[in-house]
């Protein structure tokens, strides 16, 4: 606890994904005062043509009350 899930389009390198996960974990431990052993980060790649159905509608539109950072695009 906590577990962070990042959803993004495919195409980022393994090195970029590892670095992103490391930086997210560092910020979570620093801001929320958890030990690094408590933090997990998953990266889920979603194809651009599936984004509206698999991410935008269920995670952004249908759960807007849980968003702390909203995107500046609409679909």
Show where each model-derived region lies.
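A domain-level signal for the structural core that forms small-molecule/cofactor-binding pockets
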Residues: 2-75
């Amino acid at each position: 606890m906590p577990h962070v899930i990042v959803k993004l389009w495919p195409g980022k390198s393994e090195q970029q994904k590892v670095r992103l996960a490391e930086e997210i974990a560092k910020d979570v431990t620093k801001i929320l005062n958890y030990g690094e052993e408590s933090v997990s980060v998953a990266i889920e790649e979603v194809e651009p043509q599936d984004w509206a159905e698999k991410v935008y509608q269920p995670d952004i539109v249908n759960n807007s009350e849980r968003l702390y950072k909203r995107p500046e695009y609409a679909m």
